[in-house]
Amino acid sequence: MMDIRYSCNQRDFKRYTTEETRKEFLIENLFQADQVVPVYSHVDRMVTVGVMPVNEVVSLDKGIDIWKNFGTSYFLERRELGMFNVGGEGKVVVDGVEYELGYKDCLYITKGAKVVTFESKDAAAPAKFYMVSAPAHCSYETRLIKIADAAKKPLGAMETSNKRVINQFIHPDVLKTCQLSMGMTVLEPGSVWNTMPAHTHERRMEVYFYFEVPENNVVFHMMGEGQETRHIVMKNEEAVISPSWSIHSGAGTSNYTFIWAMGGENQAFDDMDTIPTTELK
């Protein structure tokens, strides 16, 4: 069943309790054996999905009323989708074409793909497919991007606790998409901060998915307007929705990795409003 999240404005958000904030923006329990776990956000109509095939070959539309939720005859009739495997070895079949995904490999599936299935090579070490889908009006090319083939951009420094590598997968410099962009940021041991100085992008929303968070550790994800911030305490393999008006930054009790996904008006990465760190409140 689709979990529907409606849009929230920044004025109402200021009055949210901790419980309300988590219910509105946090996505938990994405990986359930042989199930499709979908969350539909009305912010730019992005859908976040988790699939963990264990004993079955799992279809993308399993348990989803496609007409009720999308008004189409199949999931990707008017959508594109990007996914990462954050588990064991797995296979994705798209309209009869097989794609092998290892750990941290990425697959972009273009608009119009009708039949998409998932399976794991080893039920004892199942694949975990984390994916985000955005509306699309045109088709490009379904493509597998291995972690080794991602565009890599080292940033930050140990002195500022944010030494990291940004891996660009579904990105204009790597392949063409309708509006979806996705990548993976890996923090080095000893670094804990991401996306600081913080920013917003008025014409795009973003979803963060935190993983490789060690046991008994958490990430404090910062959100809200720069002048009135809030936080959500997040555990391993959880995602969080970030509306266009909200910052999206985080600090962990250890280093970690996160996948970012964006959709909206454009794919211009410099179309953002940076907030000086000393001006945050």
Question: How would you describe each model-predicted region?
Answer:
Residues 87-126, 132-135:
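Acidic, low-complexity central loop/insert segments
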Residues 1-48:
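Non-cleavable N-terminal signal-anchor transmembrane helices
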Residues 40, 44, 176-239, 243-247, ...:
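Acidic/His-leaning functional-site neighborhoods
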Residues 75-102, 211-236:
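A short beta-strand-loop-beta hairpin characteristic of the jelly-roll/cupin
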Residues 53-54, 89, 215, 247, ...:
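Short, glycine-/Ser/Thr-/acidic-enriched flexible segments
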Residues 123-164, 224, 259-281:
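Double-stranded beta-helix
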Residues 101-121, 233-254, 263:
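Conserved metal-binding segment of the jelly-roll/cupin
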Residues 28-69, 163-206:
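A short glycine-rich, His/Asp/Glu-containing loop-to-beta-strand
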